């Protein structure tokens, strides 16, 4: 699918394969006698492996000059180097044979598959981080709620303290009434508990180890035989890329839901914090009043 | 292959068309040129106009405008993907300065076939491009939501900082309250003790007075 990133526009016309020729599929051609497909060796640079020396570097066939695996390896790595270099050292893409371009297409397809798999891995890492973040946010939300409950408890204790301070004035002193600007209500209970449920669900998944399993590898594809031609291999890579992209799309969907949940959780916490601010302000004011009353009692 | 989704395309510098390509005849070049005149050249952005079941898509960047006229059955994203490809190719070929000095329609012969190739490529790979566009859109959606979340988290952080200051203040006030409570308790305990001792003293004094009055002195043998 994404094997070749550049459009046919980037390949000059003289290099295109004539589809009206006797061969039905230009990729099947191993016959290099046709001048349409090949260039004279004189035009090649020394760094390029000569096609006369080998039948197909990608089809797993033997190199004719020698059976040594080292020479085969060096040829293959040389090709890889050229692909990475976009054939700059060997006259550019225009001056390559069909066979080399087939190899290049396979190489590019594999590279693209690798990058899609890389994206998928990154997305999975982000998902696991997002899960942890969501769990952490939920815990922090609960901490804020607990803090708010504590503020309510402080309010109750303070009310008792104020009563006692009021009764300590003595017989002839005027009674002390603490000022209350507003009642302390405690945490606002929201009906929507979906993030909580979601977090519990995610925690369960995490404990079961379901989130860490990469989904990209779930689809098993039969490996192609060694004799498979470049076209089949590119098609297989395209299929892998399609699978990777659909997995990536699924993960991104999950990430979106998680991001929305994070947003709603943070928003809920912000609202809770606003209420807590007001309650803490009220407590501060009342403790200050009680302190003034205490000082007055001590001063008598 | 005879693609019929893309009708007409051009690349312009300002309002001067440098290269154009079409396989059809019609009034779309003049409509596109009119649209080009109205484009705000200063901003780098994308514009789409609809006219008679056709979309006129523009991509403006660095003083150059890239346009494609397509049938409205073709999605906007595909048209934009085409314009992005044309832009990249145009910059690659003429970025060195040739484009800035080129006269009207002087690049037709060179760049026209290139635009044709891009049209064919985009139409041939529309499904694949749409898949990629969908994933890109999902990524940007998640990114925008997360950017909002970051803003919210920053607000939350500020809220927590303010709350920390307030609770710190409350803690110091509460410590003061506790200290004063202890002092008040101690003071009241002393007061209480003092009262008890005074009452006890008075009682003892009363007992003593009664004793003296009954016994006419301290000798009470009778």
Curated annotation (Swiss-Prot), chain A:
Localisation: Membrane
Keywords assigned by UniProt, alphabetized: Cell cycle, Cell division, Coiled coil, Membrane, Phosphoprotein, Protein transport, Transport
Record region (Disordered): 1-76, 176-228
Coiled coil location: none
Tissue spec. comment: Ubiquitous, with a strong expression in root tips, ovules, very young leaves, vascular tissue, hydathodes, stipules and the abscission and dehiscence zones of the siliques.
GO molecular function list: SNAP receptor activity
Subunit (UniProt): Interacts with the cytokinesis-specific syntaxin KNOLLE and with SYP121. Binds to EXO70B2.
The name this protein goes by in its record: SNAP25 homologous protein SNAP33
Natural source organism: Arabidopsis thaliana
From Swiss-Prot, chain B:
Domain of life: Eukaryota
Presence of keyword Cytoplasm: no
Pfam families named in the record: Longin, Synaptobrevin
Residues in Longin domain copies: 10-115
Statement: the UniProt record of this protein carries the keyword Cell membrane: yes
Tissue occurrence: Expressed in flowers, leaves, stems and roots.
Topological domains annotated Vesicular: 219-222
Gene Ontology BP terms: protein transport; vesicle-mediated transport
Topological category with respect to the lipid bilayer: Single-pass type IV membrane protein
Gene Ontology CC: early endosome membrane; plasma membrane
Subcellular location: Cell membrane; Early endosome membrane
Topological domains annotated Cytoplasmic: 1-197
Family: Belongs to the synaptobrevin family.
Its biological purpose: Involved in the targeting and/or fusion of transport vesicles to their target membrane.
Designated name of the protein: Vesicle-associated membrane protein 724
Organism: Arabidopsis thaliana
Name of the gene this protein is made from: VAMP724
